[in-house]
């Protein structure tokens, strides 16, 4: 693979010289600023060999570098080895930003040109790059080229998978109602139209689903909401007859995907809300300047607050998912002891058990099965090249989830397969303590995730441990497993936590080359009480699956923490046992015994 990457970079540099570029920047995104993208837009992976979901690759005529976050440090070091790309660790002291690195690398040039594809870089990203490099005097930015159009000769086509209806029994609100709410919010912020580019927002507001992006039930399209009209820009071959009839009944006009630029140029309204931080440069530039109203799409916040139907759907999906997970856990240890199991075989077994459940549509992300040292790679994915046998000792970390018609799941369990070291047991218990502290907390309405993040970290901080990823993210309703705008993380995120939002609780500790521990449940934010000091919120734990008690150092848990775990396990048993029989039911009984 390293030979292939070096050959590709060599061809890119030849192309750059021929077309007047000194450097080119490759983000992870697509024209819709998606976190996970269709294969057609995996340009950064193609040029660098780095397969993680987040990262930016930069190639100059002499050097190459790749920026990514802590979830991928270990994986990136392995994948970039021998490629000539230098790993730049984001949010680590001493790591330059992309623009700082470019300014240094290009300082000896009398005139340098940095390329960014305007179709996959946001308007805000391009503007920031231009501003940061403008002070150097010798560097300009161009957005009018995509080298992949010439170099990536076997590039996958833009997907044309069929779109399907997402019925009211699962969505809980009609498209017309959602559009009315959107239009009201637009009036409140002084705009009369909205350009929607995020694929999950389009799917949500139209009550449609697709399969254009692996594990994400979305479809490639744009949506333009004006005072009188709604226009969906999409390849017409993706629409079966029932979807066409539905769109017609909702008075939604359908135009070709490629015609969106022309539609924006001819926009007849007075002002169009455009999110410059997520809308690609080419699209944002097509809107007449005098009609641009810069702001954030209201759909993300609307989608994040689940209605009653969606909340009940999550509960039902978590119940079925819990049954599948328990069947897997009941099988796991004896299967490992019998021999022949690997990380990939565990992944396949868990997916097969989920597929037996009603309303299963697929996995919600590529399953992480990390045995021992692989568990320390936060977003590890076993491949035939990295797959290892799973032995009856140590820890295995399994982070997995599924897409069901009525909800999306995300769960992590770290399982003791046999004898553990004292360090493994203490680390496991610290992670569990943090998980429990966050789950038990109550907080005032209006609080943001960063204001409660420390609860999950405090137990491990006291013993000198930490983790560099976020503690929690929103989860879509048969949509993307990662959604915002809210998060629970150390860095400030201004989106308040609201009743009806889903969010994960997933603290962890990772010791490179040794092992990793993460415990994750998906939670629903619900009202707690109202006092003289205002309204307070709390969490309802949606995920139903035992937390392994074998690694716990019991004396490290407080009375309240033991009580929480026992109560949770009682609820897990009462909820899941009616759907289990024989050995699996008996295994669950033992796994949920009080400690």
Language model regions located:
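Active-site neighborhoods and metal-handling regions in enzymes and metal-associated proteins
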Residues: 1-595
């Amino acid at each position: 693979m390293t030979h292939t990457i070096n050959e590709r970079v060599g061809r890119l540099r030849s192309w750059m010289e021929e077309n007047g570029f000194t450097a080119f920047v490759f983000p992870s995104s697509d024209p819709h600023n998606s976190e996970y993208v269709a294969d057609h837009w995996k340009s950064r992976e193609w040029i660098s060999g780095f397969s993680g979901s987040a990262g930016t690759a930069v190639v100059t005529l002499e050097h190459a570098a790749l920026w990514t976050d802590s979830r991928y440090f270990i994986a990136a070091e392995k994948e970039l080895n021998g490629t000539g790309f230098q790993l730049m660790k984001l949010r680590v002291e001493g790591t330059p930003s992309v623009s700082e690195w470019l300014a240094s690398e290009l300082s000896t040039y009398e005139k340098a040109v940095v390329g960014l594809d305007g179709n996959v870089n946001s308007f805000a990203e391009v503007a920031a790059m231009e501003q940061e490099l403008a002070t150097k005097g010798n560097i300009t930015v161009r957005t009018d080229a995509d080298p992949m159009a010439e170099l990536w000769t076997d590039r996958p086509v833009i997907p044309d998978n069929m779109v399907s209806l997402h019925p009211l029994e699962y969505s809980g609100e009609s498209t017309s109602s959602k559009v009315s709410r959107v239009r009201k919010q637009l009036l409140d912020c002084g705009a009369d139209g909205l350009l929607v580019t995020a694929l999950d927002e389009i799917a949500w507001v139209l009550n449609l689903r697709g399969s254009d992006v692996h594990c994400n039930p979305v479809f490639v399209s744009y949506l333009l909401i004006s005072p009188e009209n709604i226009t969906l820009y999409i390849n017409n071959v993706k629409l079966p007859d029932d979807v066409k009839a539905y769109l017609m009944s909702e008075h939604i006009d359908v135009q070709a995907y490629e015609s969106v630029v022309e539609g924006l140029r001819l926009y007849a309204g007075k002002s169009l809300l455009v999110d410059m931080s997520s809308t690609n440069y080419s699209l944002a530039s097509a809107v007449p300047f005098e009609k641009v109203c810069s702001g954030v799409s209201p759909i993300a916040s609307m989608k994040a607050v689940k209605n009653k139907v969606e909340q009940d759907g999550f509960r039902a999906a978590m119940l079925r998912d819990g049954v599948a997970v328990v069947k897997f856990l009941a099988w796991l240890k004896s299967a490992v002891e019998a021999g022949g199991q690997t990380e990939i075989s565990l992944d396949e077994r868990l997916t097969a058990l989920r597929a037996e459940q009603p309303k299963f549509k697929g996995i919600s992300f590529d399953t992480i099965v990390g045995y021992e040292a692989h568990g320390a790679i936060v977003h590890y994915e076993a491949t035939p090249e990295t797959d290892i046998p799973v032995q009856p000792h140590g820890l295995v970390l399994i982070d997995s989830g599924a897409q069901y018609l009525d909800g999306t799941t995300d769960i992590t369990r770290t399982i003791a397969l046999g004898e553990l070291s004292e360090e493994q047991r203490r680390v496991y218990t610290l992670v569990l303590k943090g998980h429990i502290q966050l789950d038990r907390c109550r907080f005032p309405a209006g609080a943001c995730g960063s204001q409660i993040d420390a609860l999950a970290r405090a137990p491990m901080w006291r013993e000198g441990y930490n983790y560099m990823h976020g503690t929690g993210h929103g989860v879509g309703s048969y949509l993307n497993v990662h959604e915002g705008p809210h998060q629970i993380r150390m860095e400030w995120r201004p989106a308040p936590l609201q009743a009806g939002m889903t969010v994960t609780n997933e603290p962890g500790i990772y010791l490179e080359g040794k092992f990793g521990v993460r415990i994750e449940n998906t939670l629903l934010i619900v009202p707690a009480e109202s006092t003289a000091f205002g309204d307070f919120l709390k969490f309802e734990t949606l995920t139903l699956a035992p937390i392994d008690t074998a690694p716990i150092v019991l004396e490290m848990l407080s009375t309240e923490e033991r009580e929480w775990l026992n109560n949770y396990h009682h609820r897990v048993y009462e909820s899941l046992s009616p759907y289990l029989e024989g050995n699996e039911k008996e295994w669950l009984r033992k796994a949920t015994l009080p400690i």
